[in-house]
Curated annotation (Swiss-Prot):
It comes from Colletotrichum graminicola (strain M1.001 / M2 / FGSC 10212) (Maize anthracnose fungus). Its main location: cytoplasm. One of its GO terms (cellular component) is nucleus. It comes from the Eukaryota. This is Restriction of telomere capping protein 5. Keywords: Cytoplasm. The keyword Cytoplasm applies. May be involved in a process influencing telomere capping. Residues 145-164 are annotated as: Disordered. Residues 331-550 form the TLDc domain.
């Protein structure tokens, strides 16, 4: 849709003309002809007209995307799209959302820009930060002061890595806030114009920050839309924004927000923290925007079942039956936690593909029950454990026994919250470990509550999972812990070792400890990118769950089983007995095998 412009001729074109040229190229390369038709039809049906200019308003956008009013996030989303709509001339933001501007929004929000702007394919996260950020001098100064205070606090908590002076590269340094906007530069190169001429005074990330309250609201929306696909409407999840479900949604958003900043000390998120945390802890955070904004590419006016010349028939279509995201909620895993997991694990392995394998409160808190329920599952698994923080001084004989089995505590707690939730993703089947650990390099250790944190597997240490039992070894379940030595009579009271970043559960699944030795490092899992200090959390276990992540066969079997159960339930619901036609009723019961052949079908009295 348009020939390549030369640098000389494009200098004489206005921003509007160049934007139209880029929008045309985006539409040609990123949309099918049917999607272009649908997009124009949807825009025409939604747009307001003022002075011959057609544009979208905030309430129109929110209504079309079905964003729940209770989240109060519509102004935040509109700020984002108004900024992105000005692409690539971001100095002109906020933009009036006309047809060309909405092409920019839909292409970028659905990540289809990668088909055209290969150079800036990884720069979308930075553009989203800038679309959410504000430039407020007072707030920025407060954020800088809070960050400085946090660093000083971390410095006092952490000890030097060695008594011997190390290399300068070992010392923590402030990451520079890179202002090379690859996505915009790639767009200028596509138009064959000099980006230095056109960038002007485009907003920079230095001094910019995302207000904490705005990001909290956006997180609630992102949790809600995480399982969405392009054929689903957001209104399908309306029950998740009422009552206890809404409270759970807010709580999950708070845990995620805590990964980016301490809300008690900082008013917003700086780019350095955002850029450090996002790739490790939330690589899929914004993935839900893709199906949400793809709704602009489906027009309700397109009906391929109607023949030319026929009048539309006002017939109510049967409501589509959708398989639930979870077969049943667990004590730890609910729909909000499921979305939280999808921010760093592939959603294709989670939504409608999980199966409960083991629950401590149902199956018993013992290694034997765990083995019987989990060891035969041949696909990946997710272990989740939740507990309540215990005091430094043991209370009672059981806590004292647990405290004596691990090294003395020397680190402070990692957070203020009393309830703690940890987990591990394991791609290989579980087994007993007599001498060495098991697990692959895609094993992930993580924390979900009260601070979301992710600890990827290290490339230098493979002590991922230990599951030992007597009499060969001292019984324990360890993640990132050195494998215990074989038991001997004189060693039975020997303490268990904790890894630099590790999770250990005792043999009765009564107590656990998470250790984060940031100073030492070098363990099976990487240290935290957001909490750069040493900490340790000891807790009494309340819930322990293991979920199986179905492979293709397991997922198909689960979907078929659910569909069969739904059909059977629907068939039973539709059987209407007691209508007065006894012969018809009896015939139905005989077909079901409930009467006949000696069965009376009478009362149970």
């Amino acid at each position: 849709m348009g020939q390549v412009l030369s640098d000389e001729s494009s200098r004489h074109l206005s921003h509007e003309e160049l934007t139209h040229e880029l929008a045309s190229r985006f539409a040609d390369k990123c949309f099918t002809s049917l999607e272009i038709y649908s997009f124009k039809d949807v825009f025409k049906s939604l747009a307001d007209n003022q002075g011959g200019i057609r544009y979208l308003k905030e309430d129109t956008l929110a209504r079309f995307l079905e964003i729940p009013d209770i989240l109060h996030v519509s102004p935040v989303v509109f700020q984002m799209v108004s900024y992105i709509g000005a692409f690539p001339f971001l100095q002109n933001a906020p933009a009036v959302l006309g047809l060309d501007q909405m092409v920019m929004v839909v292409v970028i929000m659905t990540q289809r820009h990668k088909r055209v702007l290969a150079k800036g394919a990884t720069d979308r996260a930075k553009l989203l930060f800038k679309s959410l950020a504000v430039h407020d001098r007072t707030a920025s100064e407060a954020a800088v002061a809070a960050e400085k205070s946090s660093k000083e606090e971390q410095a006092t908590q952490s000890q030097p890595r060695s008594h011997v002076a190390g290399f300068a590269v070992d010392e923590p340094v402030e990451e520079p806030e890179d202002d090379d906007d690859d996505l915009e530069i790639a767009a200028f190169e596509l138009l064959d114009i000099n980006d230095a001429v056109w960038q002007g005074d485009a907003p920079k990330v230095q001094g910019a920050m995302i207000p904490a309250d705005n990001f909290r609201k956006l997180l609630m929306l992102l949790i809600l839309i995480a399982p969405l696909n392009a054929q689903e409407r957001l209104s399908m999840y309306s029950t998740r924004v009422t009552g206890d479900e809404l409270d759970s949604l807010r709580a999950t958003a708070e845990h995620i927000l805590a990964a980016f900043l301490n809300v008690e000390k900082a008013p917003g998120i700086k780019f350095s923290q955002y850029n450090r945390v996002l790739p490790v802890c939330f690589p899929n955070l914004f993935s839900g925007f893709s199906p949400l904004f793809e709704h602009f590419l489906f027009s309700k006016n397109l009906d391929f079942t109607k023949h030319k010349g026929e009048e539309p028939v006002a017939e109510k279509q049967p409501e589509e039956i959708v398989q639930p995201l979870l077969p049943e909620p667990g004590e730890i895993l609910n729909l909000n936690v499921l979305s939280q997991l999808s921010f760093f694990l592939p959603g294709s392995d989670l939504f409608r593909r999980l199966r409960p394998l083991y629950s401590g409160n149902k199956d018993g808190f013992s290694t034997g029950s765990f083995e019987g329920k989990v060891f035969n599952w041949r696909a990946p698994t997710i272990l989740l454990v939740r507990g309540t923080r215990i005091d430094d001084d043991p209370r009672g004989s059981q806590q004292s026994t647990f405290a004596a089995s691990i090294p003395p505590r020397r680190f402070p707690s990692g957070s203020k919250g009393e309830r703690l939730t940890f987990g591990v993703y394991v791609s290989t089947p579980w087994k007993h470990t007599a001498k060495e650990t098991f697990g692959e390099g895609d094993t992930v250790l993580f924390q979900l509550e009260p601070v979301h944190d992710v600890f990827p597997a290290s490339r230098y240490n493979s002590e991922f999972i230990s599951f030992t039992k007597a009499p060969t070894n001292r019984p324990m379940l360890g993640v990132g812990c050195p494998h215990p030595r074989p038991s001997q009579a004189h060693r039975r009271n020997e303490m268990l070792s904790l890894g630099s970043v590790s999770l250990l559960l005792d043999d009765s699944f009564e107590y656990g400890v998470f250790n984060h030795d940031w100073t030492a490092g070098g363990g099976a899992f990487a240290t935290s990118v957001s909490r750069k200090f040493d900490f340790q959390d000891r807790f009494e276990i309340e819930s322990l769950e293991v979920w199986g992540c179905g492979g293709d066969e397991e997922a198909k079997s689960q979907a078929d089983r659910w569909a069969w159960e739904h059909r059977e339930a629907e068939a039973r619901r539709k059987v209407n007995l007691g209508t007065g036609d006894n012969d018809a009723d009896r015939a139905l019961l005989e077909m079901a095998g409930l009467v006949g052949s000696g069965r009376s079908g009478g009362s149970m009295a």
